[in-house]
Amino acid sequence: MDDESLVRLFERTEVPPDGFHHRDHVRVAWWYLRQHPLPDALARFGANLRRFALAQGKPDLFHETITTAYLLLINERLDAEHRGLAWEEFAARNGDLMTWKPSILARYYREETLASPKAKRTFVMPDRLQTADAINERAKSGKD
């Protein structure tokens, strides 16, 4: 299925739940980010994902921190990898974004943080990511 057809089905909530997996979520987010500035893509994808979850009878499935964090990571990769890449090439170069479990978010968040009600309802900043200063200090001291 081409990108626009998948997005259209997603927006109409016509994709069957067993036919819309993590990789499809990433693909739709990737499409939004190629078409819209980051704030608009975040708003559109989030609103449509909420509607999709509601249509599937799972209104509590939407998770703000997971959704926002993935869009931020995808956007960063698009900027680094060039927005002109076709989906299959982008997916091949970014395999770590395509795996749901284990998730790339484990690099940035503690499990209990993502499991919190606060992280579900509003975006929470990463709590596992070390600052560049801390990494540089460890490197200078020879501690790894």
Q: Where does each model-flagged region fall?
A:
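Intrinsically disordered, low-complexity serine/threonine- and proline-rich regulatory segments
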Residues: 1-15
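Short linear motifs in intrinsically disordered/low-complexity regions
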Residues: 3-4, 19, 134-137
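Hydrophobic core segments within long, regular secondary-structure runs in both alpha-
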Residues: 4-7, 46, 71, 88
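Conserved, aromatic- and glycine-enriched, well-ordered alpha/beta core segments
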Residues: 13-84
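A charged, amphipathic interaction segment
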Residues: 63-144
